[in-house]
């Protein structure tokens, strides 16, 4: 059994490769939920949904979010009616948010709601939100704290930020996540944003302790000297971390056994394994996944 720590953009590309090589039933994906929020009355869990849609064969892999071929009629109708509708949510995607919101309002945990959605979509991989507690990533601007989604989507990451804040400061991993980490044979830390995607998972109580007991392979999100997607560099700077593979390794060094960085990366991480981590298509995703699995066998 393999457990993968994932955000919503970089790591799903690696999951695409693992999907081609490993039976879905042997994969557990622990997913960041610190970017979740309620919007237009419904519960958005973007990283969880990306992983569900990937394994369901529905993901829009042009954008790496949402459902392929979705329409946006409800969003277009809501925009003039709601100041809060700042994210373009597809109609089928919104149906998932509505269903999840209803389950949460009726007393289900996020883990239970996610399990129900996976069953509904026929997903065989085990997809686990990192925590059942509400967690939010906020960024500090000159006008105060704003949610990460507002910073990245509404303001396109163009607002100067001074720090990254998690609310609340302490939160627990779900029992299902703790069990998955205890029972798995190895852990892959995917190439997602180390501050806003992987960071919240690592901040869950007990998670770092469990990782130290397992073989762990981490893949840097940096291609060359820049992250392939998202605002990782700006967020790492605001967190006081060097925006590079070396800075990423520094966040993981306490538990990682093998660190993988891109062949084009000019910043050398001592002891790192060099691979082509630019997963621009299925073939590239599968090739990197095969490399990671081979490295995993070397740790057995």
UniProtKB/Swiss-Prot annotation:
Binding site for 7,8-didemethyl-8-hydroxy-5-deazariboflavin: 49
Gene3D superfamilies xref list: CofD-like domain, CofD-like domains
Protein's GO biological process: F420-0 metabolic process
Enzyme class at the top of the EC tree: transferase
Pathway assignment: Cofactor biosynthesis; coenzyme F420 biosynthesis
Cofactor(s) the protein requires to work: Mg(2+)
Pfam family, one: CofD
CDD domains, A to Z: CofD_like
Transferase recorded as keyword: yes
An example Gene Ontology molecular-function term: magnesium ion binding
Catalytic reactions of this protein: (2S)-lactyl-2-diphospho-5'-guanosine + 7,8-didemethyl-8-hydroxy-5-deazariboflavin = oxidized coenzyme F420-0 + GMP + H(+)
Alphabetic keyword roster: Magnesium, Transferase
Cystine residue pairs: none
Its EC number(s): 2.7.8.28
Job description of the protein: Catalyzes the transfer of the 2-phospholactate moiety from (2S)-lactyl-2-diphospho-5'-guanosine to 7,8-didemethyl-8-hydroxy-5-deazariboflavin (FO) with the formation of oxidized coenzyme F420-0 and GMP.
Complex and partners: Homodimer.
Family that this chain belongs to: Belongs to the CofD family.
Protein name, entry field: 2-phospho-L-lactate transferase
Source species: Methanosphaerula palustris (strain ATCC BAA-1556 / DSM 19958 / E1-9c)
